[in-house]
Design a protein with these regions (language model features):
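Bacterial N-terminal signal peptides
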Residues: 28-37
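N-terminal leader/targeting segments
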Residues: 6-7, 34, 145
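N-terminal targeting/export leaders
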Residues: 38-157
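Short, low-complexity intrinsically disordered segments
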Residues: 13, 21, 36-38, 95
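Bacterial N-terminal signal peptides that target proteins for export
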Residues: 4-29
Length: 157
């Protein structure tokens, strides 16, 4: 018969046969190593771009993260984006623009679309909050957007 409240000396209260102080101190180096290797704050925030009616099947994402120097690292990725020459009217290239609040758009570079209709542009910017949009242009070094916006997004860092 078992009495309640009585201790059983043959039953161990711990699953490890070592004292608690040794067991917990052995965990500290492992926890510290995980903290150094874990990518805290290194993951990118992703924003989905909205397609224009001219390219309804196009998809785009903007991935942003803060770099080591405090600037914003930006990766613009597109899928199923038609070649600019297939648009009406046909154009030569796509240009990615960043527009901070109360400022004019800045040309961040040409977005090249491959034969699989995928595109990517990686760049760095000093902005936290800005609009991202892609236009079809006659040339890549234009100072201001002239072509139609094909994908747009708002980045609120």
């Amino acid at each position: 018969m078992i009495r309640t409240g009585q201790a059983f000396p043959s039953v161990k209260t711990s699953w490890l046969p070592i004292p608690n102080s040794i067991r917990y101190s052995a965990l500290i180096p492992g926890i510290m190593g995980m903290m150094l290797l874990w990518p805290f704050g290194d993951t990118a925030k992703k924003v989905t771009m909205m397609p224009a009616k001219e390219v309804p099947g196009a998809q785009g994402t903007v991935a942003v993260k803060t770099g080591k120097n405090g600037n914003t690292e930006v990766d613009v990725t597109t899928k199923a984006l038609a070649q600019p020459s297939a648009l009406t009217p046909p154009e030569e290239t796509y240009v990615v623009w960043f527009q901070p609040p109360d400022q004019s758009p800045k040309n961040m570079g040409a977005l090249r679309v491959d034969n699989s209709l995928n595109g990517k542009l990686s760049t760095v910017a000093p902005y936290r909050h800005f609009k991202v949009f892609i236009t079809a242009e006659k040339q890549q070094n234009v100072a201001s957007p002239h072509g139609a916006k094909v994908l747009t997004a708002d980045v609120l860092g």
